[in-house]
């Protein structure tokens, strides 16, 4: 039954989520400590189509922190293009990489690096990124409701709280 709900959810979110221009993702820098393994990310970030790798640093978008430190147009384009390509490659999948707390980590990393990613983006790219964020927001909220208490991580709690705040939901 859970698989059925996931399939329905994926179909609904991929077709019917509309980008609300009133939702703002700028200046949401809440991350204080950086636990990114830069040596591991450096080993794959310059490879072609690295978004296809089954690597947790790719699937939770930890590479965004490395790209941000790399800076410049190269880092921005590398980040943005790989987010878009990763999403196109994985948006219809039901299980991996939409398991555990990967969705929550991705959402947190996208939000934290949003200003960096969009600094040289055109309107269409910003709209696409907002749609990707909203898919993650709805996915986090949906998965949080159906997760067993023992499966919830601190990333899930942060992402769920952030998701509800973004959507303006009452947290009571």
Q: Where do the language-model regions lie?
A:
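Extreme N-terminal leader/anchor segments
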Residues: 1-53
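Aromatic-lined, polymer-binding surfaces characteristic
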Residues: 54-172
